[in-house]
Amino acid sequence: MSDISKYTPMMQQYLKIKEDYADAIVFFRLGDFYEMFFDDAITASKVLEITLTKKEAGQTVPMCGVPHHAAKVYIQKLITKGFKIAIVEQTSEPGKGLVEREVVQLITPGMIIDDDILPKNEYNFIGSVSLSEYGYILSYADISTGDTFILNGLTKQALTDEVSNLKLKEIVLTNTSDIYLLNFFKQESILVSIYTNQEVQNTRIVRNLKEKHLKEAGSLLINYLEKESKLDLSHLMPFESVIVDQYMRLDHQVLNHLELTESLTGNINSTLIQWIDKTSTAMGSRLLRYELTHPLKDKELLEKRYDYIEAFTQFEPRNKLESILEQVYDLNRLVGRVSSNQTHARDLVQLKTTLSLIPEFKEVLDSFDNPLIDEMNDKVDVFETLFQLLDASIENEPPLTVKEGGIIKDGYDETLDEFRSIAKNGDLWLEKFENEEKERTGIKNLKVGYNRVFGYFIEVSKGNIPLIQEEFGYIRKQTLANAERYITEDLKNAENKILSSKDRADKLEYEIFNQIKETAKTYTHELQLLSQIIASVDKYISLSKVAEMYKYVRPKLNHNRIVDIENGRHPVVEQHVEFIKNHIHMKPSEIFILTGPNMSGKSTYMRMFAVITVMAQTGMFVPATSANLPIYDAIFTRIGSSDDISGGKSTFMVEMVEANDALTYATENSLILFDEIGRGTATYDGLALAQAMIEYVHTQIKAQMMFSTHYHELTKLSEKHDLITNLHVKAIEQKDHMVFLHQVELGSSDKSYGIQVAALAHLPDPVIKRAKYLLKKLEKDGKGIDHNLFMFEEKVELGQIIPHDIQDLLNHINDLDINQMTPLDALIKLKYLQSLSKEKK
């Protein structure tokens, strides 16, 4: 630190604190404001759009500030932009000398406990990344709810997919050596923090983790949170070890293409979650959203979820539960705030209100008379002792502040009641004293007042000052423009007694509040279990209600890789337009080549299939009259046109990257959906690539696939392969316009109707007429169409195609950044590749 002696003691205090929090914006408490100085002030003033001014502190320094009572709004804005905030509070009473101050909390995008700043229906995860000989380890937690998870053995691709899907707000790394990951986190706007302590200190949270490398990986995150947040994190639950293989793989691109939780256009009504989330609580909504992005592969677990949906179809008790749940507060985050000592009395009132509903909640669950629901209900505790404590002690409408009284009910504590009685009688005494002084002095507008600087006083207007006589015993205390303020010995004695009792009452009330809070904290983990049950009930009620509203059916699951969907619908599209139902009947390893005009519904048909599959493997009923589905290990999509300007990738390049992902990682148990691959390049190139991809999937991967295209030449592949089937979306020409029937049938489309679609878009008539003329000429001359690639197919022997599993191993090797690896990293990676090689054998 440079010489700080030229600054005032207060500014020196600030600079010493800032040195320890160089990467954070320091909110420095001065009276009723948080002030920021130097570069913090310059940055914050721009982001917050507040005035940048100057402060004299031995030297002139840049300064800006925000009111203490409105700080949350400003903190939220900074957090949203990815900043860290160090909150500095006064920790000693004002007196002689400099008031002591210290950082009481570090708020970062991943370390938020305040419900006013957090998104209500989403988790707010912070994660850490470690590398072991088994691959990457991702630990993540939401400190507002106490949930903690850990995933082991991830590839770099799987790691980045999961980070995107979880929408991590902050990531903790042990070093900055992996440039690829750093660039990825930057692109995703994820705050990166560096921390190295992996020593196992909190054994409770890592107790479920058996292997040493997992305990250390989990400890990296927990140690960082405990050191940096300065919160009591006893509410964090033991790590839940997530087995990657139990979930269907959905990368971030698939989530985007299918618009499960986020819209491509920013329109929330185009997302699936908007139409299936009928939950009544924030807890249920968060659970539903999380499960939707983590579909299962376990048939037994999925069947149990379906059973729960059926169990909650009883209309009357379900409605009663809904009305109860609508009154339930966010118990999970309430418990988090109470446990982390970031609570106020209103949180305890909300906790009491929620607990008051549990006996009826339990009673209604019992009325379903269903063994599955009974099993859930048996775990519900009514917390009678805690409820009675809160009901007897906390006022129903307490203030937000916890140190200025008004929290504890009369009659709860005898000593507190005694202090309050003295203070109350003091108020009566003051009222009587004022009336007596008016009578004694003859000054009718005399009044008795109070302020924190001078205490109690008698105020007399300027015009009545001559009426003050010496025998009144008035001692001048303060001169105002229009009045004088006085005290008397009697008033001074009363002040000492009244203020003493009020001060003692406030301090005792704060002590009692803390005792009650500490008692509530002892129920933390039991309350978390209750919140999980409430969330599950809420989720199943929502899914049961949605199934009835939209006529969804329970899917059947098979291990035969057969698809039979009767009258399938897209659950979002049908909310906006009348939807034409379609069937999907697919054999194992079958490939559908789908042709038809633009706007005819090819992409919607493919999306419908994918969304129905995701819904089924999330444990939901699906939009169809019947559905028999395989359990997929992954869905790969390339649907719609997009580019990546920030990444320097064209539409065609993005197509190829996403196609490569599918061709590299798909298995025979995967579902691949490609929409018009190859359109972004020359016709020959695009057609050749499309045919090569279809053949590769058919011969090497053997996954089920839908491939929509305008290359009608590809439909000839069905003549050579039994498991390649042509489908088309029906459309008919009527005079000079097109009618799209949106029905998918066997066979191929005879043409693309591109000019007719252009006419529907109201292109100028001269353009349409010229296009029709040119098309006829091209068809007559045989130029530009019917490029038959099949005459060349023998030039590439099937045996020359690298087997899929070997290609996977080669991709791992090609992904290595040798320039960034240490010798130890190289040995770890070599061992990992060796294990992969043994698996392939």
UniProtKB/Swiss-Prot annotation:
It holds the Pfam family MutS_IV. InterPro entries: DNA_mismatch_repair_MutS, DNA_mismatch_repair_MutS-lik_N, DNA_mismatch_repair_MutS/MSH, DNA_mismatch_repair_MutS_C, DNA_mismatch_repair_MutS_clamp, DNA_mismatch_repair_MutS_core, DNA_mismatch_repair_MutS_N, DNA_mismatch_repair_MutS_sf. Transmembrane segments: none annotated. GO terms for biological process: mismatch repair. Keywords: ATP-binding, DNA damage, DNA repair, DNA-binding, Nucleotide-binding. GO terms for molecular function: ATP binding; ATP-dependent DNA damage sensor activity; damaged DNA binding; mismatched DNA binding. GO terms for cellular component: cytosol. The keyword ATP-binding applies. ATP binds at residues 596-603. SUPFAM superfamilies: DNA repair protein MutS, domain I, DNA repair protein MutS, domain II, DNA repair protein MutS, domain III, P-loop containing nucleoside triphosphate hydrolases. The keyword Cytoplasm does not apply. SMART domains: MUTSac, MUTSd. Signal peptide: none annotated. This protein is involved in the repair of mismatches in DNA. It is possible that it carries out the mismatch recognition step. This protein has a weak ATPase activity. Belongs to the DNA mismatch repair MutS family. This is DNA mismatch repair protein MutS.
